[in-house]
Each structure stands twice: as C-alpha cells, then as structure tokens.
Amino acid sequence: MNELTTIRPSTPKDWETDQEVRWCPGCGDYAILKAVQRTMPEIGGTPENTVFVSGIGCSSRFPYYMETYGFHTIHGRAPAVATGVKLANPDLDVWIITGDGDALSIGGNHTMHLLRRNLNCQFLLFNNEIYGLTKGQYSPTSREGTRSPSTPFGSVDHPAKPCAFALGSGARFVARAIDVHKNLPSVLKAAHAHQGAAFVEIFQNCIVYNDDVFEPFTAKPNAQANQMWCTDGEPLLFAGGTKGLALDVENLTLKVIDVVDGDTSGVIVHNVRNRAIAHMLVEMPFGPFPMALGVLYDDPAPTFESAIVAQNKAAAEGKVADLQKLVAKGQTWMVDKQPHAI
C-alpha cells in the first residue's frame, strides 16, 4: 500500500548554499540575496524547479549562493542562455541576475530581445551605476561627470535609463526597488506573479566604488520626501501624503501639486496597465520630482515560450512533408552537365 508523503514547505534556509558569499562587506548584494531567499518560500518555489542565470559582474555570482540549478554564463549573454533553458523546459522558474554594465553594455542587444519576445522569467538588474568587478570604471548608467579610472576628467556620456529602456523594448512588467528596502520582497513577488518577462531595476549600493550614489532618495532623512511608492489604484503621493503628481494638460507632462487636507482630487491615480503613465514615471527627472518605486507597469501578454510550444505542436500534428518536393520547390534550375567555354 502506497503511503502519501507530505511535502514540507521550503524555508529561506533551504535556498542557501554552503558557498562562502564573496562580496565586499556592506555590499547591497547581500540584502538582495536575503530578500530573494526570503521570497522564494512565499511564492511556493521549489529549488529543484528553479534556475538562476547570470552573466559577468559582481551581481553575477548570485547563482553560487542559491540552492537551485544555475548558470554563471558569459558577459551579457544571460538572456540568451535563459531563453534556451525556458524553451527546453517551459515549466522551470527562470530568474536572470545581471548588472547595469552586463545588461546594458555588452548585453544590451540580448536584453532588448528577451524583453520584446516576452519570455516568462524574472529579470533582476542590480544598478549601482558603476563597474564594480573591474575596479570602478564608469558604466552605461553612470551620471554625467562621474569620475572613474576610465573617465578621469568626468564622464560626458548621457546615462541610460534602465526602466525607460525596458519599456521601449516592449517589456510588459517594469518595476523599481531599493536593495535594503522592506518593500523589495513584495516587488519580487509581483514580478513572479506576472506571466511574461518581468523587469525589475534594483538600486544597489556599491560601498567601494560608488558609495551613497543613491543617498538623495535612499537615506532615511531623505526617504519620505523623495521616494514615491506606486500602488495600483492609489493616488501618486509622496512627502508623507502632502504632495502628489498631476497632469500638466498644456504640456502633457507631470507636475507636482500640494495636497491640502487630504484632498487628492487632482492627483493621478496609478494604473499599472497604463503604459503612458509608466513612461512618464520612468522619465521624470529626480530632483524636481521624487523617485518612482514599486510596480510601474504590469500588463501581461502571451509569452514567447507558449507561442513556440503551440507552433511546434501544430507543426508536429501537420502532414509529413515530401523531402524531394521541398527541394524542388520555388525557383529551381538545371545545371548544364557540359562545361562552357571560357
């Protein structure tokens, strides 16, 4: 007689490996790792059905520290490997771990194609605005004026905007979070619940080469005034609910308005399915505006692997083709057996 075996739910400890975590003391990657390990049991994940894929960089050591299947691949190519993994076994839960340099420099083309194809996976981009592994060169997201070994007089490049890039590439889920913030697990859970490519930019502090670059909105004294956590169906408020975002109708842009006595009638209500709102949120400049955080866009569409599976199934169920007819199909001609005189 067969006995039923009760499957014990996993715990964060089940997702930890015996590997020594080799990041600099105080690196924001530690907080992200713990957040992911805490999140996995809450989403009902199982280590044997989960795959972490990374490229090259400090963040890309991530698969070594997750008790799952993993691929530490080559520079910028994590999306390509992840696509192969998902197509080989669509039932796997695939997570891509990358950084601003890995994803937006050498891997920019692969990132774009993964997002436009809408592969069902979670894409976590650790943005510290610097190359950490190669000792502090400026990255695609480094701000103008950033001094580094490769830009000793200050960078003259305009920085890439990861979330704007993702939306422009056709991503159907775009979110932002902070490495040490308590809301990071909830953002990760929302990304996992989305069916399709879920792009999450995580502001990650590099304590060695770019320390406190995000302090204007991450430091405790600045957080309330400069962070705006976006919740679907709720008004876009910040500064303790005393300010909000409204639409400047004349210029079709956003503007900041004061919220008096709790009156939010003029404030935009966040709608995660509204792509126009998402574009405005990721493009608004920090300083005059707060930093928009949380789920900015979430509008599912059919996934890449489901379309491939359906296409292959239809092809397999079709009539077997005649090879000779296929060879002779289209523009064909006979080659003269007799050589022509030159």
Segment roles from a protein language model:
Residues 1-9, 18, 208-342:
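Flexible, low-complexity linker and terminal segments
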Residues 23-25, 96-98, 173-178:
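Short catalytic-loop micro-motif centered on adjacent basic/acidic residues
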